[in-house]
C-alpha cells in the first residue's frame, strides 16, 4: 500500500482527480458515510450511523470503521491512497498506518486555499500542524515533499 498524507486544506481531493490517486474521504463516504458533525457532504450524502451518542466515542468508532473500509479497499485494489494527518501521534484517529510521503504545499498556496473556502482564520492552527507534521515525518523517516506531483513521482520510484 502506497500512502500520501497532507495537511488539511492542502488540496488532496483536488489533486487526486488530476493525478490519479485515491482520496480516502471519497472511499469512506461511499462505503459508510460520515458522521454528520464532520461536515463532509461533498463526499457523500450518507450519514454514518452508530448507536453511540458521545461525539468522541462516535469519532473513535468511526475512525476504526473507516480504517477497515480503507484496508479492505486497498487489499482489493492496487492504488496510491491519500489520507489526512491521521497518522500523527497527536491525532485521535485509530489508524495503524504511517504514510510513505508527506506533502507540505507552499505556505502562500496553503493560505490561498483557506481564503478560497472562507477559512483563513484557521491559518495559525494549520501552520502549527504543518510544522508539527514535518517534524513527526522526519522523526519517522517519512519523505517530505512540496507538491503532490513530487509525491507521486517518489512513490512510483520507490
Label the model's feature ranges:
Residues 1-19:
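Glycine-rich phosphate-binding P-loop
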Residues 2, 18, 88, 96-99, ...:
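Compositionally biased low-complexity segments enriched in polar/charged residues
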Residues 8-9, 83-89:
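Short, polar loop motifs at secondary-structure junctions
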Residues 17-71:
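Conserved substrate/cofactor phosphate-moiety recognition/catalytic segment
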Residues 31-37, 108-117, 155-156:
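Short, charged, surface-exposed secondary-structure boundary motifs
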Residues 81-85, 94-114:
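Conserved phosphate-donor/acceptor-positioning beta-strand/loop module used by diverse small-molecule
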